[in-house]
Each structure stands twice: as C-alpha cells, then as structure tokens.
Amino acid sequence: LIQPRKDEDPTNINAVFTPQAGGINPMFAQWANRNYPLSMTGAVGLSCTMDKGYDVVPLVVSPVGSWTELETTDFEGEVPVFNPKAGEINQQLPVVLALTRQLNGKEQRILIFGDADWMTTGEFSKSRYYGVANGPLTTLMCSWMADYQYPTYFPRPAQPDNHLKLSYSHEGP
C-alpha cells in the first residue's frame, strides 16, 4: 500500500481506526473520531473469510487516497501513479483485523496486522509534526489480549481538544 504525500515516503501510510473498533476499546472510537493515525511502512491490505467461526472487526484501514501499488519499485526515483489497468486497487483496505470466538467457554482473541514495522524502535523514534497511535496501541493491544487484566486499565473520557496557544514577538523599530 502507498499513500503519496509531499515530503513523505509513499510507502508509509497513515492508517485510520474504524468506528467499529470502538467495540473493541472505547479509545479506538475516540481515535477514529479524531483521525489519530497508525503509522505503517510497507503495509499490505488484509482479506478474510467470514465463515470460519470468528467474529471479525476491521480495526484499522488504509487511508482514503492510498492504493495497492503494483508497478513502482523504486520509490526514491519514481513517482507512483495509480493504474487500475495493472490491477491496482484504490479503496480503503483493512490493515489490522481483530478476531474473537468462544472456545471451551473462554473468548479467544487474535490481532492480525498487515505490517510488522509499526511496532519497532525505528517507528517509535521517528520525528513527526503530528501524533500517531503506534505507542499507545501497543499498550492497549496487550491489555485487550489479556482481557483488560494487565496492564491496569482505567478508561477516561476524551478531553476536549480545543486549546490553541499563539504568541507573537517583534524585533525592530
């Protein structure tokens, strides 16, 4: 998947949380409402069948304007162009799936990611002018997998994001 943007690697997509993700964790619904992205480099879209006994929730999807790039291989020297004739797909595709099912009286929980690099030191240490969900998702993912028993889970209502601080300084006559 690619997401061409000015001054950014096109293979790095800012995937978005789905409204359905709020059923897994209320924080994900807040992230979906605020367009809080999950940064993924080299991600692939996932497909699944729904007839294997699992409840499947598309947790995170590729952003609008991204597509499956099949022709460009040199992203530093070439500008990728969407080509549907080559079989490229321009639609939001799942990049993270949450699966659940009842098994022997217990709930089995599975997360499938279309990218492994989202949870690396390299991804966590990138300097950006916008926030990403990579770090917080790591903790919430582990908490969900452990049925919110570890780490301690204290959901809080979203705080309003309506503060703007401006300053001005002028030097000279």
What are these model-derived regions, one by one?
Residues 151-173:
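Short, aromatic-rich amphipathic segments at membrane interfaces
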